[in-house]
Structure formats: C-alpha cells, structure tokens
Amino acid sequence: MQVQKSFKDKKTSGTLYLVPTPIGNLQDMTFRAVATLKEVDFICAEDTRNTGLLLKHFDIATKQISFHEHNAYEKIPDLIDLLISGRSLAQVSDAGMPSISDPGHDLVKAAIDSDITVVALPGASAGITALIASGLAPQPHVFYGFLPRKAGQQKAFFEDKHHYPETQMFYESPYRIKDTLTNMLACYGDRQVVLVRELTKLFEEYQRGSISEILSYLEETSLKGECLLIVAGAQVDSEVELTADVDLVSLVQKEIQAGAKPNQAIKTIAKAYQVNRQELYQQFHDL
C-alpha cells in the first residue's frame, strides 16, 4: 500500500505534474496550468512543435522534452532519473488530459513505482465536455478512446460491448465515421447517438439522433474535424419492444448481402436485438 500526501510530504525527489491543455480554445487554459508550466524544470510534450506554439502564446520559456508513444519506452527511465534527482516535470498531451489516449499512463505508473509524487491538474477533457452536453445519460459511462480500424476487429468489438448499459464514448476519424456507424447499427441496433465535432472551436457541432438518422444526414453532409462519438447504453426493455416492429429476417439478409456468412449474420442480428439465436435461425430458414 502507498499513501501520497501531495503537498505535505517533504521529499528530495521532484514532482510529476499532469497538465491539461486546451482542446481547441486557448481561453480554456487555466491560470494554474500556466503557472505550473512556468515553474517546472522540464515539460514532457507529445509534439514539441504543437506545444511550442502553446508555450509561446503564454510566454512560457521552460525547456521541452519530446515524449510520445514511439519513444516512451526509452525515455521513461531517463525521466524517472530526473525526478529522483529533484527535478520537477510537467507532462502534456497535444490537447486535453494527459494519460488519455497518450503514453502518459506508463510514465505515471513508473513514477508511482519509484515513490515519486504525481499531481494531476483539472482542466479540459474532450470526453466529459461532450458527454455533459450530449443529452445522453452521463452516468454510468465508459470511454474507450480510438476504435479498431479494421472492419472485422471493429465488429467483434461492438458485438462484445452491445449489451453494456453504460453510455459509451469513442474517438473516430471523420473519414471512417460512416463505416463505423454502419457497423455499430448492425451490432447495436438503431440506438440514440451523438456525434460531436470541432469541440470548443468555431465550428463546434452536435449531431443528435438515432444511428440511422445520423447516417442519412452524413450522406448529404460532408464531415470535417476531430470527432467524438457518444452512444446510448443498452436498454433491454426498449430493445425487446423494438424487435416486434423490425423484420429481423430482412436484416439477416442484408448482412449476407454485405458479405457475411449466414450463421454469422444470424449471430450478429440476434445479439443486436437480444433475441434467441436458435429461434432466429429457425425463422430465417423457415423451419
């Protein structure tokens, strides 16, 4: 067991600060974040060029150390040595909270293992910011980060998560969003979803509706900018009622036309609408 008293313990080692940065609007930078970045000895940045612009805007002269997913393994021992020697470090990502979809978690774990104080500053977070304005249930919720890119892996992911009652959040590229929603529709059914893009920026947009409605909208509207997808959790009662008005056999046939094998198509639709797979099999084959 380990007990950390962030501001009371007198240690010879430095402190690792996790500093959030704006996700699009520089006015979201906090006074404490600016002060911390000025006071630490080094800033560990995911992209030194991107962070350099932020530092210049706020007149911060602290030296940067490049720290990203491609060099984290080799850099972490050196960073821990700096902390043990008494230097304080701030870790930042390109936007938002460190450790969320970046290598910060590994650095935090290494610091804790070395009994180094880790202090997180509150601030901008894309997932929570979008969630509270989405209109979907804010709790319970689960954030998955970036989805698998390959269609097969993505479908398997959705099939595994379709019955979860929590509101689900994902990052996705605007170039893949239609394919992702199509895969989600096949596995989750036509749930409520909110597609958020350009969060905190001039062209911030929330698209709220069912998955099929969002897909129809995207057929007529181009999509640009960073996207965050929020999906309602499974509601058994409503999904059972929905199946009474849905031609499940036709949905199975559509899956087959899209390239799925009959048994896999039956399994996918049975999971999406929470019906007995054997009964759907018999219905499809008219047994």
From Swiss-Prot:
- Subcellular location as annotated: Cytoplasm
Q: What Enzyme Commission number(s) does the record list for this chain?
A: 2.1.1.198
InterPro entries for this protein: 4pyrrol_Mease, 4pyrrol_Methylase_sf, 4pyrrole_Mease_sub1, 4pyrrole_Mease_sub2, rRNA_ssu_MeTfrase_I, SAM_MeTrfase_RsmI_CS
Q: Which UniProt keywords apply?
A: Cytoplasm, Methyltransferase, rRNA processing, S-adenosyl-L-methionine, Transferase
Organism superkingdom: Bacteria
Q: Does the record carry S-adenosyl-L-methionine as a key word? A: yes
- The answer to whether UniProt assigns keyword rRNA processing to this entry is yes
Q: Name one GO molecular function term.
A: rRNA (cytosine-2'-O-)-methyltransferase activity
Q: Which reaction(s) are listed as its catalytic activity?
A: cytidine(1402) in 16S rRNA + S-adenosyl-L-methionine = 2'-O-methylcytidine(1402) in 16S rRNA + S-adenosyl-L-homocysteine + H(+)
GO cellular component labels: cytoplasm
User: What's the stated role of this polypeptide?
Assistant: Catalyzes the 2'-O-methylation of the ribose of cytidine 1402 (C1402) in 16S rRNA.
Report the family membership: Belongs to the methyltransferase superfamily. RsmI family.
- PANTHER family named in the record: RIBOSOMAL RNA SMALL SUBUNIT METHYLTRANSFERASE I
Its protein name is Ribosomal RNA small subunit methyltransferase I
Q: What organism does the UniProt record list as the source?
A: Streptococcus pyogenes serotype M3 (strain ATCC BAA-595 / MGAS315)
